[in-house]
Amino acid sequence: MVLEAWLDAAIGGVIGLLFGSFLNVVIYRLPKMMERQWAAELAQVEASNQGKEPPEDTQPTFNLMTPRSRCPACGHVVQWHENIPVLSYLFLRGRCSSCRTRISPRYPLVELATGALFFFCMHRWGATPTGLAWCGFSAALVALAFIDWDTTLLPDDITLPLLWAGLLASALQWTNVPLFASVMGAAAGY
């Protein structure tokens, strides 16, 4: 039983590292995606106010999946083996493999934080709906914390699903927070 708990925690930690790598993409791209959307909406309003046709969006696709991650200094496309959480950063000594520009230590920090939180959640609650719910909440909060630090924004794309997921988890008794307390917290926080 004890070995199983540690195995769940170790697997959770590794999965957390992988999620942390994806969260780095979310933290970097989601605010930029929001800014692009705001600019497009503003251009449409301005065109409408001037009686013109709204401008066509000619910018290349930019979302959480496209384009592939690149070095901001030289444009080198990050290969799969350069994107292994924490290990690639250590192997590359914190530098781009192409131009040797320094990579922020924040990337492995996000990965390690997410891995540690998933490890804790899986150790505390095991591979149960409760453990998985807390892993999801932890991942969302890591993304929100870093986005807030960078931009002072808390994107609705994360906060609103988090609110509903919290209420659902409470209703299904996956947390020890009573549903009434969750609803009151959601009402007060929103």
Indicate where each model-derived feature is located:
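Functional transmembrane core segments of multi-pass inner-membrane proteins
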Residues: 12, 130-190
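Conserved Radical SAM active-site core
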Residues: 115
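C-terminal ends of transmembrane helices
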Residues: 24-29, 93-98, 141-153
